[in-house]
Amino acid sequence: MHKFTKALAAIGLAAVMSQSAMAENLKLGFLVKQPEEPWFQTEWKFADKAGKDLGFEVIKIAVPDGEKTLNAIDSLAASGAKGFVICTPDPKLGSAIVAKARGYDMKVIAVDDQFVNAKGKPMDTVPLVMMAATKIGERQGQELYKEMQKRGWDVKESAVMAITANELDTARRRTTGSMDALKAAGFPEKLIYQVPTKSNDIPGAFDAANSMLVQHPEVKHWLIVGMNDSTVLGGVRATEGQGFKAADIIGIGINGVDAVSELSKAQATGFYGSLLPSPDVHGYKSSEMLYNWVAKDVEPPKFTEVTDVVLITRDNFKEELEKKGLGGK
């Protein structure tokens, strides 16, 4: 009996030691589609923070396309990683990502963009951490309307330019939420004009906005809606090119970190502000959830919606960015 007890104790000690060794050497991946974007740099920074706090190593890999994504999963497996968080470059890669991860017995959490299957249906079996796109869009519309009222614009001389990218689910939910909030506040639906952009960057939105502006020379004041800072900035640049003054334009972006140089300009522009979401929360939370899943077998919820957002303007952007650890970017 004494020998048996000692044997049990030895087994228990070995288990504890192997668990602590696993925690010491635990590696988890964090793959992002656009590492040059401040949003993803911040996610990486806070994934690292979670790693330091909880005791695991974060392997950060850029995955700008499908081939690099699948190669990155091979690399993670070769380095002994037990799972990864990913913002995929293409949601339709979802099935391939999941299949490859399963082949290596790795856990997967999607962040920012939801996987879809070959038929374009959301893969809701994969845990997802995501910005509350509709709610943030609604907030954009509410803030635009509030600032318009503050400036005392005549609604009959005003219009909304919504620069859309409806093929992207997140973009569609943001711009639709914004337009719905404007209508709910009392802005006339007939004065809300939509124009699709070929790309969600400044040049694409600039071209889209120019095509809209020439169709409506009667409009004296524009509210600009877009899915991110760059699309709204493209719209603002187009209005400047058509001779509009900053006081006659209100653009509010979404992202915040991409608006810093604009909000830092000596003179105010038509870009009034941006809704700063929480890449810090996304990076930390998704990594923490993956760690708990791998190390403690605590399966994460299938959907974690992040609603934290703050309006940053010329008056408060430095202070608000500092609060999120984004100061100096």
Predicted regions and their residues:
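Extracytoplasmic "Venus flytrap"
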Residues: 26-46, 50-54, 59-71, 75, ...
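Periplasmic-binding protein-like
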Residues: 29-30, 81-89, 107-111, 161-162, ...
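Short, solvent-exposed amphipathic alpha-helices that sit
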Residues: 39-54, 136-143, 169-189, 204, ...
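Structural motif
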Residues: 58-80, 195-216, 232-235, 259-260
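Beta-alpha junction/loop-to-helix N-cap segments that form part of ligand/metal-binding clefts
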Residues: 64-131, 229-235
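Hydrophobic alpha-helical segments within soluble ligand-binding/sensing domains
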Residues: 69, 128-157, 205-206, 255-261, ...
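Venus flytrap/periplasmic-binding-protein-like
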Residues: 109-119, 225-272
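Hinge/cleft segment of the Venus flytrap/periplasmic-binding protein
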Residues: 162-165, 170, 277-329
